[in-house]
Amino acid sequence: MRLKLEQKTILITGVAGFIGSCLAKQLLSTISAVKIIGIDNLNDYYDVKLKESRLVKLRLYPNFVFLKGDLADKSFVEKVFTQYSPQLVVHLAAQAGVRYSLVNPDAYISSNLVGFFHILEGCRHLKETAGHPVEHLVYASSSSVYGNNRKLPYSVGDPVDHPVSLYAATKKSNELMAHAYSKLY
């Protein structure tokens, strides 16, 4: 199945990160009339100046809109979905880092679990507010979900029932929430 991306509005979370900024740039430079709505909280876990330099380059594209905000803020996420009505959502935002999850677990619950829940809810309710559903949600998980599996390379069929970090547990939880939402809604 090939997605038609021309003339679509695509929401990319984590747009100031390496993958998010590269994806946004690729879409803006190769797809006709695509509009990218990029969200990032610009937290300082990674170098903020590096994130800002990526955004400077993306702002050169007239079809790029950047919104600074926290996905754990339900009203912020609701406003984004209401105002921009994206047809596609690429969720790359997350509080990253296995070791940091030992020091600041609240950040992982807030960003990774609550934030992703708000994205799922935004997708679910868009049809009511905009008259069209989100056509596709792409979620970026992490190889951390494979924990102590010794078999390489990893496979999607490998067991991932025993995460070894809170970060991995939040990423696996998000996979499960996305699966449940896809079946329920």
Language-model features: where?
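N-terminal Rossmann-like NAD(P)+-binding domain of SDR-like oxidoreductases, especially those catalyzing
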Residues: M1-Y185
